[in-house]
Swiss-Prot record:
This is Class I hydrophobin 1. The gene is Hydr1. Disruption phenotype: Leads to slightly enhanced mycelial growth, small conidia, slow spore germination and appressoria formation, cell wall integrity and virulence. Reduces the cellular lipids content in both mycelia and conidia. Interacts with the lipid droplet coating protein Cap20. Its main location: secreted. Residues 1-19 form the signal peptide. It comes from Colletotrichum siamense. Keywords: Conidiation, Disulfide bond, Lipid droplet, Secreted, Signal, Sporulation, Virulence. Disulfide bonds join C45-C113, C53-C107, C54-C91, C114-C131. The keyword Membrane does not apply. It holds the Pfam family Hydrophobin.
Length: 138
């Protein structure tokens, strides 16, 4: 095989770019959430969930070791991975009247999407989830 100087140069440049240090996942997530407005967050949450500011993240739901049995265990394990799903607690709603404000100016804790009526779980699977951090939905 015969490589031209341009091919070798292009390959070397591509490897250099691939090896360059990048942002950590936490920094990248912070950049994405810093520019969100309350209206953007509501669009991410959808019409059935409301944007909330939460005080705590429940670490007991942060692990998904796929040790459970049942139909959803394998499906959720494949979707969520080993990081699991972080659920939140101590949440209060962020008003819709401030839709154009930046989200980080309204909430310094964890921003989450919460079920509006919180008391009912209906449907085929009927899983009642409390609040889910918006960072997990981005």
């Amino acid at each position: 095989m015969r490589f031209s100087a341009a091919t070798v140069s292009a390959l070397a440049m591509a490897l250099t770019v691939a090896a360059a240090p990048g942002n950590t996942a936490k920094e990248a997530l912070a950049k994405r959430t810093d520019d969100l407005t309350v209206a953007d967050a509501q669009n991410i949450c959808g019409k059935d969930l409301s944007v909330n500011c939460c005080n705590q993240v429940d670490a007991s739901t942060n692990n998904n070791d796929n040790s459970g049995s049942g139909i959803l265990s394998g499906i959720l394990g494949g979707v969520l991975g080993n990081g699991g799903l972080k659920l939140t607690d101590g949440c209060s709603s962020i008003g819709v009247g401030i839709a154009n404000d930046l989200l980080n100016s309204q909430c310094k804790q964890s921003v989450a999407c919460c079920k509006t009526d919180g008391n009912t779980a209906s449907g085929l699977v009927a899983v009642q989830l409390p609040c889910i951090p918006i960072s997990g939905l981005l």
